[in-house]
Amino acid sequence: MAGLGFDETELRLGLPGAGELAARSSGKRGFAETIDLKLKLQPAAPAAVSGEEGAQEDKEDADAAAAAADEKMSMKRSASQSSVVTAEPDPDKPRAPKAQVVGWPPVRSFRKNVLAEKCKAAALVKVSMDGAPYLRKIDVAMYKSYPELSMAFQNMFTSFTIGKCGSHQQLKESNKLRDDLEYVPTYEDKDGDWMLVGDVPWEMFVESCKRLRIMKGSEAIGLAPRAVEKCKS
């Protein structure tokens, strides 16, 4: 017992020989262990290489997708251009006649000219009446006789009492106006003279009438003798 040391006779909890393993493990790392550790860490390098290869493959896939998208866009553009070319009208085929447009937006100049020609063809005459705050326009050529024109005056100015236009023969037989007439239709001829409506034949009246005025009977009394004298001459 005297030859045994304190460490050998010390009682400890643990497996037999655990103390020696602890002593060995507490020492410095040996050369062999260091080499083994380096060899175990070397396989990490190929992993990095494989990551670079994956990135390269992803880039190639992205480039291929972009090229496919560009090809689709070029195909769409070519299809749209071909449709525009096919939509062009045939120069040999005659165009359809354009319909006349009335209202807004304003019509074009050539259509205005057509409307102006139609207005010139019609014998439009202004019609005014003493005491009426408005004017009218009528086409004298639309009517066939003086009685029709008289009815048109009655419809234009319904609130006034207008004398009926007699025939040319009736006016020649009477040299004065009736006193009971409130308004009498008169007209201005090409010479600028004011005369009673009905003092000349209807065809001559249509050609010479420039303006119509329905004046009061008291103001038109002096026109009857002059109209009759002009008819006689």
Swiss-Prot record:
Cellular localization per UniProt: Nucleus
Motif window: EAR-like (transcriptional repression): 11-15
Biased composition (Acidic residues): 54-63
SUPFAM superfamilies from the UniProt entry: CAD & PB1 domains
Protein name, per record: Auxin-responsive protein IAA11
Name of the gene: IAA11
GO CC terms: nucleus
Induction notes from the record: Not induced by auxin.
Function: Aux/IAA proteins are short-lived transcriptional factors that function as repressors of early auxin response genes at low auxin concentrations.
Family annotation (PANTHER family): AUXIN-RESPONSIVE PROTEIN IAA16, AUXIN-RESPONSIVE PROTEIN IAA17
One biological process term in Gene Ontology: response to auxin
Transmembrane segments: none
Primary localization: nucleus
Assembly behavior: Homodimers and heterodimers.
UniProt-listed Gene3D superfamilies: Phosphatidylinositol 3-kinase Catalytic Subunit, Chain A, domain 1 (3.10.20.90)
Record region (Disordered): 1-27, 46-100
Tissues with expression: Highly expressed in etiolated shoots. Expressed in roots.
Keywords, alphabetical: Auxin signaling pathway, Nucleus, Repressor, Transcription, Transcription regulation
Residue ranges annotated for the PB1 domain, each copy included: 122-217
One of the Pfam families matching this protein, by short name: AUX_IAA
Family listed: Belongs to the Aux/IAA family.
Keyword Nucleus: yes
